[in-house]
Amino acid sequence: MLTVPGLCWLCRMPLALGHWGICSVCSRAARTDKTLCPQCGLPATHSHLPCGRCLQKPPPWQRLVTVADYAPPLSPLIHQLKFSRRSEIASALSRLLLLEVLHARRTTGLQLPDRIISVPLWQRRHWRRGFNQSDLLCQPLSRWLHCRWDSEAVTRTRATATQHFLSARLRKRNLKNAFRLELPVQGRHMVIVDDVVTTGSTVAEIAQLLLRNGAATVQVWCLCRTL
C-alpha cells in the first residue's frame, strides 16, 4: 500500500524491517516528551495520577492515550491523510498509536477494550472525502489487538458546523445530541479512536452516550492531543 515501499514516511530513509512506513528512530522522536495526565492527556505533574483539573471536573472517560501534540512531525502526515487522500498513511499512523497503547499497558496496566469505535463523519462529508480517517485507524488496531470494531456503532444524526473555528462552549452546543448509538454496549469496555483531540468536545459527547447506555468504561485513543 505504501507509495515508496520500504521508506520511512518522515525521514525517507530505508526501513530496516517491515513496511509499516515509519522507522523506529522517527517513531521514538514523534512521541511527546511532556508528562501528561493519564485521564485528560494534558500536561501534568505526574503521568500516573489524574491532574488537578480532572480531580475537580473529570472528563466522561477514564483514560486518554495519545502519541504527541498536534505539531510536526505528525501534523503534516495527519493533514495528508485527511485532506490529500493519502489513506495509505493510515497503517503507519495506526502502528504509532498501537505502540503507545502497548507502552501504557506495560507501564500503567491499561485496560484493553472489548470494542473500539470510530468518531463518525456526517454522511455528506464522508462521501466528499471518500473515507473516514478514524475508520482507517481502527481497522488495523482491531486486528492487532483482537478486539471488535464496527464502523456503524455510532452514527451522526445531523450535520454539524466545523469545530475548528468554534469556542469550547460553542463546540459543546454544536455537538449536543449529534450522535446515535446503534449497538448494545452494556457492560463493555469501550475505546473511542480519533486522529486529533482538541478541546475533547466530540469524544466527550460520544463517551457520555456510551456511559448512558451502560458501558463499563470508556477510553479515548488519539494520535495527537492539542497540548
UniProtKB/Swiss-Prot annotation:
Alphabetized CDD domains for the sequence: PRTases_typeI
Stated family: Belongs to the ComF/GntX family.
Descriptive protein name: DNA utilization protein YhgH
Organism the protein comes from: Escherichia coli O6:H1 (strain CFT073 / ATCC 700928 / UPEC)
Function: Could be involved in gluconate metabolism.
Residues forming coiled coils: none
SUPFAM superfamilies per record: PRTase-like
InterPro entries: ComF/GntX_DNA_util-trans (IPR051910), Competence_ComF (IPR005222), PRibTrfase_dom (IPR000836), PRTase-like (IPR029057)
